[in-house]
């Protein structure tokens, strides 16, 4: 199974700069992580007003972004081993926004997981409760636009001296899993 693929997008630098500006200037609670969460769903239409080239960036793949999350980490415990409860497909596309150099998304097989719902954001994921049969199978540094399998067990490690670590995780009108197969 292929767990990730780095891809090229148009207007990459514009999307990164617009995202960082949006988070700093319009979502300081998220940028500064004053809310006790790492996964912040954003209003897609509002986000696109501040990041007007987002849809153009993915036009070559014939996909339209309809789900935007800012993922903000301060420590390695912020993204312990988990499986996303993403019901709209197997993959999303992640973009590095800030301080991602040297961080890794590590994929596993095995393990036993239990649903967890963040009491603040109401977002659910499956957290590891037993390492039975757990085996590392792959890893990637999110240093460019990357398709990742979010519904497979994974965790993120970061350089805690470079905080916050921010990525954007995007969903689309059709699952970009087809990009893993190209």
Question: What are the residue ranges of the model-derived segments?
Answer:
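Non-heme Fe(II)/2-oxoglutarate
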Residues: 1-64, 68-69, 78
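Intrinsic-disorder/low-complexity, polar/charged segments enriched in Ser/Thr/Lys/Arg/Asp/Glu/Gln
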Residues: 2-6, 90-92, 167
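Compositionally biased, intrinsically disordered low-complexity segments enriched
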Residues: 7-10, 84, 97, 156
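Non-catalytic surface loops within mature trypsin-like serine protease
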Residues: 11-13, 74, 97-99, 172-174
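Short acidic, gly/pro-rich beta-turn/loop elements at beta-sheet edges
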Residues: 15, 80, 103-105, 177-180
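A short, structural micro-pattern
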Residues: 64, 89, 162-164
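Catalytic core of non-heme Fe(II) oxygenases with the double-stranded beta-helix
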Residues: 67-69, 73-145
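Catalytic core of Fe(II)/2-oxoglutarate
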Residues: 117-182
């Amino acid at each position: 199974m292929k767990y990730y693929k780095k891809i090229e997008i148009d207007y990459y630098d514009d999307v990164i700069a617009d995202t960082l500006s949006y988070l700093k200037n319009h979502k300081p609670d998220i940028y500064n992580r004053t809310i006790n969460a790492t996964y912040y769903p954003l209003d897609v239409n509002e986000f696109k007003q501040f990041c007007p080239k987002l849809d153009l960036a993915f036009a070559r793949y014939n996909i339209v972004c309809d789900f935007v999350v800012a993922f903000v980490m301060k420590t390695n415990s912020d993204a312990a081993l988990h499986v996303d409860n993403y019901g709209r497909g197997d993959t999303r596309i992640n973009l590095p926004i800030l301080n991602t150099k040297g961080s890794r998304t590590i994929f596993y097989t095995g393990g036993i997981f239990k649903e967890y719902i963040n009491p603040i954001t109401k977002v659910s994921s499956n957290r590891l409760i037993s390492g039975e049969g757990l085996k590392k199978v792959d890893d990637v540094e999110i240093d460019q636009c990357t398709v990742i399998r979010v519904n497979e067990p994974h965790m993120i490690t970061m350089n805690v001296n470079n905080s916050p670590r921010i990525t954007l995780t995007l969903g689309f009108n059709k699952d970009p899993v087809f990009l893993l197969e190209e």
